Amino acid sequence: VNCGQVNKALSSCVPFLTGFDTTPSLTCCAGVMELKRLAPTVKDKRIACECVKTAAARYPNIREDAASSLPYKCGVVINVPISKTTNCHEIN
């Protein structure tokens, strides 16, 4: 997995993550599902996590509550936290 793939998967989620939209779009949720598919191993999950943190840092107005609720709102169980503050090395 690389950051280009992660960024592409989650790019359509920015309106939801910044509070512009109240629910994630179908395209956004498809991206969350793609992120899950891209990161099957612990190593992949840690890399994806770092990519998410780097991408989130470019958007200072990302709402942490929206980010943490994104997988749940999309109905996707994913072991890659979507957060600016996650310690990615703690992912198992």
Swiss-Prot record:
Which function does this protein serve? Answer: Plant non-specific lipid-transfer proteins transfer phospholipids as well as galactolipids across membranes. May play a role in wax or cutin deposition in the cell walls of expanding epidermal cells and certain secretory tissues.
Family under the similarity heading: Belongs to the plant LTP family.
List the SMART domains hit by this protein, alphabetically.
AAI (SM00499)
> Is Disulfide bond one of the keywords UniProt gives this record?
yes
Q: Name one GO biological process term.
A: lipid transport
One Pfam family it belongs to = Tryp_alpha_amyl
Keywords recorded for this protein, A-Z: Disulfide bond, Lipid-binding, Transport
Protein name per Swiss-Prot or TrEMBL: Non-specific lipid-transfer protein B
Disulphide bonds in the chain: 3-51, 13-28, 29-74, 49-88
User: Which is one GO molecular function term here?
Assistant: lipid binding
Can the keyword Disulfide bond be found in this entry's annotation? yes
